[in-house]
Design a protein with these regions (language model features):
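Active-site neighborhoods and metal-handling regions in enzymes and metal-associated proteins
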Residues: 1-431
Length: 431
């Protein structure tokens, strides 16, 4: 690992101590005394510094975060996938001092004991509505809004707009009722998160390495008679055994289900010659993958091979263009129009010829698509990490090719970190 100086990286400037001619590391999971791996204090310090920088360049006085990815980014705390859709945890960060964290019941006590980087006086238990299960009339939203207003006054930023990423409507109304001006805080947090430190890049590389291994297991097991749901179960087992902390979703799509892409899995049984594609969405220490691969069952047809070749060409031309200073509209223009591969318009084809940032969230900046990039181009910068994905249905209707590569933007191009073989259509258990 490089000896990064967070002060050099707050604005997204990669440390001059990093030698990009070296491979990006994918070390083991254990902490060891004989080599440097992830420096978690440095990681947390970088993320707080980036958030402070993003706040300073915004018009906000503070951000109030209910999005678990933002909470983890600011506080270095997590209580698992269970909380992702509950909107029950929240954090407040003014940029003038350390963050406040309200966590679910006893988790607050746990953080005071086991998370020494957090100020124990700022680790509080909190509860709101649990997506409406607790009615507004219970008074928890009002109580929380009043407490937040008092803290903002103490920090000297109560007269400035408060950025909020996501929240339940009663919480929004309660914040407005105490006189706070509410604005979109998600954009500020995305500003902070779009440039990764080398610790984050190594974690993303390790996350991809876990999926490399899962695809090896998929390839060995992909045979006639096995079902899509069985492959999802196998991949989930392999991922958790390898250190994944959250298998968010695995798409397993095959045969006639490939076109149009349904974005799910079923109990369909694989048959000889099927084209099958998978998307593995999981995280290692919070850092996610979005990693498609297409494999055929035993054999392939000329139409399937042609579909794969075209999808590969589309992704390769995009990868070749990735470098600092490039804009997303130029990459999107290299991809086919929706009508060229069977869709009525770009909205229906959204997500098929696609690029998106990956980090603590599955979709970060930049977003690359013919739907949005022409009207709102975005400049690519060193230190961004994003996925590029393409899709092409087979001309005979028997399958479709789906490929995705994650790339790290370097000073003179990019580095691919998704390494399971994909230059040619992979035939599993050829016969």
């Amino acid at each position: 690992m490089p000896n990064d100086d967070n002060a050099n990286m707050i604005k997204g400037e990669m440390s001059p101590n990093w030698n990009w001619t070296r491979p990006i590391a994918a070390p083991g999971h254990m902490a060891v005394d004989f080599e440097e791996r992830i420096d978690f204090d440095r990681l947390r310090g970088y993320r707080v510094a980036r958030t402070r920088w993003a706040l300073q360049k915004s018009e906000l006085g503070a951000v109030l975060c209910f999005d678990n990815n933002n909470i983890r980014y600011i506080t270095g705390s997590v209580i698992g996938e269970w909380s992702r859709d509950k909107i029950c945890r929240y954090a407040l960060f003014t940029g003038n001092s350390e963050p406040y964290l309200w966590d679910f019941g006893s988790a607050a006590t746990h953080h005071r004991l086991f998370s020494p980087w957090l100020d124990p006086d700022r680790c509080k238990a909190g509860m709101l509505g649990l997506r409406g299960s607790v009615a507004e009339e219970a008074g928890l939203f009002k109580q929380a809004a009043e407490e937040i207003k008092q803290l903002l006054q103490a920090e000297g930023v109560a007269d400035m707009p408060l950025g909020v990423d996501i929240c339940e409507p009663p919480m929004m109304f309660a914040l407005q009722a105490v006189g706070l001006e509410i604005r979109d805080g998600q954009q500020t947090m995305l500003d902070a998160r779009q440039i990764k430190s080398m610790d984050e890049i190594v974690l993303l590389n390790m996350s991809a390495a876990i999926v490399d291994g899962a695809y090896q297991g998929i390839a060995e097991a992909l045979k006639p008679g096995v079902r899509e749901n069985e492959m999802v179960a196998l991949a989930s087992k392999l991922l958790y055994e390898s250190g994944s902390d959250d298998v968010e979703a695995i798409n397993a799509v095959s045969g006639e289900r490939c076109s149009p892409h349904p974005h799910n899995f079923t109990d369909r049984m694989y048959r000889p010659g099927d084209q099958a594609f998978f998307d593995v969405i999981q995280s290692y220490l919070g850092y996610r993958t979005c990693y498609y691969r297409t494999l055929n069952v035993g054999s392939s047809t000329p139409a399937q091979e042609d579909a794969y070749r075209r999808a590969r060409e589309w992704i390769d031309v995009a990868i070749e263009m990735v470098r600092p200073g490039m804009t997303t509209d130029k990459i999107a223009a290299k991809w086919p129009k929706a009508t060229e591969f069977g869709f009525a318009n770009e909205m229906e084809a959204f997500g098929l010829q696609f690029g998106h940032g990956v980090g603590l969230a599955l979709h970060e900046r930049p977003i690359i698509s013919r739907l949005v990039s022409f009207e709102n181009p975005f400049e690519i910068e060193e230190g961004m990490v994003f996925a590029l994905e393409t899709y092409c249905p087979a001309a005979d209707g028997n399958g479709a090719a789906r490929i995705e590569e994650e790339v790290v933007v370097t000073p003179d191009g990019c580095r691919v970190i998704t390494l399971f073989p994909a230059q040619e259509l992979f035939i599993a258990n050829r016969y």
